[in-house]
Every structure is written in C-alpha cells, then in structure tokens.
C-alpha cells in the first residue's frame, strides 16, 4: 500500500507502489535508487543521498525531494512544514 500521509511511515513493500495518490513515501530500506510509478508524470528516482524517508511531491515537473538530510539543491530543509517543494528550475522558492 502506498502511504499518502507524510506523517506516517512506509512498509518496504511500498518501494514501488502503483496506486499512488498525490504523494508517497519511499522507505530507506530500498537500496540504491527507487523509481516511482509513471503516474507521477514523469517517473523519477529517489537519490541515495537522501538518507531518511522522503516524500515525493507532484506539484512541480520535474519533482524534487523533501528530506532533512538532503543537500540544498532544490530539497526542502528540516525547518519546512510543507512537502510542497519546487525544483531549482522553478521561479518560485525551492522550499515550502
């Protein structure tokens, strides 16, 4: 099952869910990079540098990742309260 709440965890079986809604958690148990389904338009992968579980938002194309351990290149910072991130290519701020 795909968890759509960013306050909940995710089971290892959620590594590549198909019936995803607006967002889905990708667990750290997934090795290397994990591709999200094509329903995200386009499908993207979670980079290894994101050490904690990350939420993949679909508000922008291409999407970026919200994780405290992510570096500054488009990822949300720990102080952010929203998972709606913008990629660097967007004209809006990259976080929240």
UniProtKB/Swiss-Prot annotation:
Stretches forming Sequence repeats: 10-14, 15-19, 24-28, 30-34, 35-39, 45-49, 50-54, 55-59, 60-64, 70-74, 75-79, 80-84, 85-89, 90-94
Name of protein: Keratin-associated protein 12-1
UniProt organism field: Homo sapiens (Human)
Record flagged with keyword Iron: no
Region (14 X 5 AA approximate repeats): 10-94
InterPro entries: KAP (IPR002494)
A GO term from the CC aspect: keratin filament
Keyword Repeat on entry: yes
Function: In the hair cortex, hair keratin intermediate filaments are embedded in an interfilamentous matrix, consisting of hair keratin-associated proteins (KRTAP), which are essential for the formation of a rigid and resistant hair shaft through their extensive disulfide bond cross-linking with abundant cysteine residues of hair keratins. The matrix proteins include the high-sulfur and high-glycine-tyrosine keratins.
Family: Belongs to the KRTAP type 12 family.
Record's keyword terms, sorted: Keratin, Repeat
Tissue/organ expression: Restricted to a narrow region of the hair fiber cuticle, lying approximately 20 cell layers above the apex of the dermal papilla of the hair root; not detected in any other tissues.
Subunit structure as annotated in this protein's UniProt entry: Interacts with hair keratins.
